[in-house]
Amino acid sequence: GDTGPCGPCTEIHVDCRTDEERKAVDGKTLVNNDHPQVIEIWNNVFIQFNRKKDGSLEPLPAKHVDTGMGFERLTRVLQQKQSNYDTDIFTGTIAATEKIVGKKYMAGDDKESIAFRVIADHVRAISFAIADGQLPSNTGAGYVIRRILRRAVRYYYSYLDHKQPLLYKLLPVIAKQFENVFPELNKQLDFVSKVVKEEEDAFLKTLEKGLIKVEMFMSLDGVKLIYEGKSKEAHTLPGKLAFELYDTFGFPLDLTKLIASEKGLKVDEAGFEKEMQQQKDRSRAATTLETEDWITVNDIPSSKFVGYDSLEAKAKVVKYRKVSGKGKELYQ
């Protein structure tokens, strides 16, 4: 960041190329150059200064090393594999997926191969998170879990032609594999499986309809816009449609952007945010309550709590008032 603890850093890179490739091109020239076989596996930051707003550096009284290692990448290097997904971290999950969907993982750059890798990565992440106490939801960290899960569902639905819940069937494989280092998943396997399957069921009910909406835009609305000379609009998914996919069909915005990009479209994110804000405003207005004055019917000076000793008790209404909201009238 612009301010706060900082210091010089060093990175550890490994050249995973063949001897012939190393002789042909010096690995130093490929560091931090997005080469798939020359990878960073470790980073060390030597925290020793505090950077102030004016940019000056103030020495810290206590110094330390902030270190981070890429577990999957280090495993790849130690096991001498060409990809993280060729290591035994993922091969068991990929093999189990092959059996369920009846397709062979080809380890290529095609959509099917990518789907296998997305599923193997995402199902491990969500299963660990749920076992650790984070349930899928529509807000905060819970929504991150839901987004990851739904992205995996979309991949097996669209590219592995599998239309039934799949992820929950992979959990026993992961639980067994990691039982010595993360026993929590194995202990809560039934619960985590139930949560994941319910999430899959819920999204699968709306996924196809949402995908049809995108196809309709491309085949009908998009063609119409091109005919009208609005080529730019034809290649942009409207914010209103993106919000409908989110609100009605459960498509996270990042999933809609992924689907759109695969079809050569962009998403009107500003339009999406506008629709989102309008819905929040409507929701706030709808939850506004109007309360009338209290009406006293029994003048009782005090009451005694008896809940610690009894589950039932007779009582008298002391006072009440009318509460109006969402077109309804209630009394409290």
Spans of features found by a protein language model:
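A glycine- and charged-residue-rich anion-binding loop/surface
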Residues: 1-332
